[in-house]
């Protein structure tokens, strides 16, 4: 790292020194967010929101390709509506924000500020669904959510955040299960192929599942500090909410039946995962598919040739802008070196440099953010080379993250061994569990680790990590400390 670069990023604490502070330094220094006047809330700044827009674009396309439509439901939920489902309310009660006044008048009924929308969707579906011909109902909404968190960190846990939440209704249990699993696959595909983050997928334990759900499926990712992060969930709600909100339909056999439901969602928390999986001591590294700018152009402009270089840069920009997401940085108030460091810190996948000597040789200089590799490319080969690089960077970033996950996945056969691994290495730890919630809680009490995911095809037959009981039905699950 050059001296100038060291000075430029001196406000970023090294990961090895203080990982939490590193994370906060990166999001502030790269202008992803700023702290809002309201405790626990953040302002997502333009660069941070541009990343969310690219993520939203890739996910929204997949959601629509699987037959879903977008809609928008109210932010406010009447207390009586939320109270209809006791378990659901109990799960969210400590985090619900309430509105009790409208202007100067006390409201006749308190309104909850949306913590999630099962109740609102349930109420509307009870009116909309009458016959089997009305099914399935496949609706998604992009919205904000409020959960009054006590301990907050930007993107990872905030009192208000952005997300998408899908809510569907089906004729049969099999259809609902298929839907919940399909959307889990959608999330896995998006997070791995667009965000270059490998995930483990499977079931949540009964203790960790969504309040009111029959089953909760999830994808879990491993951050570079060895802690897990829940990246997305998909819930088979069974008929639980249908019975609470009286969502029934007349089936083909002329019998009135309850629908089967699902809900599923991911949030801006994924940006936190993006930062922690790929980032380094110099800042962000953003995979090309979700990068606001896949390529930044920095003209090298000595005074005498300034106009020539700027003219040539603009000409090249016009050639590239329809094929790639390109940023031409022709600001006069900063030196090329300053710009190099800024865009490197902001994680732009490729930097393109062009100066007088490059113009003479009919070439440009390309520098990769992920590997720091520098190359000279002829102008007539540039588009092909950029296409090749973008694909290679995307693939290499995923492979690097896969290697990290593999290298930091361990196996433990006793609670002591589990604790030692967590203290020395962290990571995902495979261990057998008997299915007893008391054992799950003992592991958490002793090690602060929770069951992150029960793989769909989990190994069976070992001895429980907590109680030692051996049974052919015991499953090998993943434990980790988590965000």
Curated annotation (Swiss-Prot):
One Gene Ontology biological process: prolyl-tRNA aminoacylation
Gene3D superfamilies: Anticodon-binding domain, Bira Bifunctional Protein, Domain 2, C-terminal domain of ProRS
Gene Ontology CC annotation, any one: aminoacyl-tRNA synthetase multienzyme complex
Catalysis: reaction(s): tRNA(Pro) + L-proline + ATP = L-prolyl-tRNA(Pro) + AMP + diphosphate
Record EC number: 6.1.1.15
Cross-referenced CDD domains: ProRS_anticodon_zinc, ProRS_core_arch_euk
UniProt comment concerning the protein's domains: Consists of three domains: the N-terminal catalytic domain, the anticodon-binding domain and the C-terminal extension.
HAMAP family according to UniProt: Pro_tRNA_synth_type3
Family: Belongs to the class-II aminoacyl-tRNA synthetase family. ProS type 3 subfamily.
Assembly, per entry: Homodimer.
PANTHER family from the UniProt entry: BIFUNCTIONAL GLUTAMATE_PROLINE--TRNA LIGASE, PROLYL-TRNA SYNTHETASE
Protein's name in the database: Proline--tRNA ligase
Species per Swiss-Prot/TrEMBL record: Natranaerobius thermophilus (strain ATCC BAA-1301 / DSM 18059 / JW/NM-WN-LF)
Lineage: Bacteria, Bacillati, Bacillota, Clostridia, Natranaerobiales
């Amino acid at each position: 790292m050059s001296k100038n670069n060291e000075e430029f990023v001196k406000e970023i604490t090294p990961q090895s020194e203080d990982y939490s502070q590193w994370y906060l330094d990166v999001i502030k220094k790269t202008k992803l967010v700023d702290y809002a006047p309201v405790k626990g809330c953040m302002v997502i700044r333009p660069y941070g929101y541009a990343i969310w827009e690219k993520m939203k674009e890739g996910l929204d396309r997949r959601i629509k390709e699987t037959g879903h439509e977008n809609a928008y439901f109210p932010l406010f939920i009447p207390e009586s509506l939320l109270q209809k489902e006791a378990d659901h309310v109990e799960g969210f009660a400590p985090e619900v924000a309430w509105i009790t006044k409208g202007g100067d008048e006390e409201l006749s009924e308190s309104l909850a500020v949306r913590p999630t929308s099962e109740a609102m969707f349930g109420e509307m579906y009870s009116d909309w669904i009458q016959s089997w011909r009305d099914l399935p109902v496949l609706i998604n909404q992009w919205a904000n959510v409020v959960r009054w968190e006590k301990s907050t960190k930007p993107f990872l846990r905030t009192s208000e955040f952005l997300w998408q939440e899908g809510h569907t209704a089906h004729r049969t249990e099999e259809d609902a299960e298929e839907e919940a699993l399909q959307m889990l696959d959608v999330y896995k595909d998006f997070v791995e192929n667009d965000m270059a983050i490998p995930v483990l997928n499977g079931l949540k334990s009964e203790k960790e599942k969504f309040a009111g759900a029959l089953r909760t499926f999830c994808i879990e990712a491993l951050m570079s500090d060895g802690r897990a992060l829940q990246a997305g969930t998909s819930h088979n709600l069974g008929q639980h909410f249908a019975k609470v909100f009286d969502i029934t339909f007349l089936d083909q056999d002329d019998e009135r039946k309850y629908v089967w439901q699902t809900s599923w969602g991911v949030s801006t928390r994924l940006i936190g995962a993006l930062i922690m999986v790929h980032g380094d001591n110099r800042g962000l590294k953003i995979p090309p598919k979700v990068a606001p700018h896949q390529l930044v152009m920095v003209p090298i402009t000595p005074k005498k040739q300034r106009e020539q270089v700027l003219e040539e840069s603009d000409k090249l920009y016009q050639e590239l802008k329809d094929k790639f997401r390109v940023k031409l940085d022709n600001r006069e108030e900063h030196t090329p070196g300053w710009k190099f460091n800024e865009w490197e810190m902001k994680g732009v996948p490729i930097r393109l440099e062009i100066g007088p000597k490059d113009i003479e040789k009919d070439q440009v200089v390309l520098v990769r953010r992920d590997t720091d590799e520098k190359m000279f490319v002829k102008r007539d080969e540039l588009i092909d080379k950029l296409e090749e690089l973008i694909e290679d960077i995307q693939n290499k970033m995923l492979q690097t993250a896969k290697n990290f996950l593999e290298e930091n996945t361990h196996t433990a056969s006793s609670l002591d061994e589990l604790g030692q691994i967590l203290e020395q290495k962290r990571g995902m730890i495979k261990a057998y569990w008997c299915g007893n919630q008391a054992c799950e809680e003992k592991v958490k009490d002793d090690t602060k680790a929770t069951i992150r995911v029960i793989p769909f095809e989990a190994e069976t037959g070992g001895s429980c990590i907590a109680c030692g009981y051996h049974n052919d039905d015991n499953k090998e699950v993943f434990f980790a400390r988590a965000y």
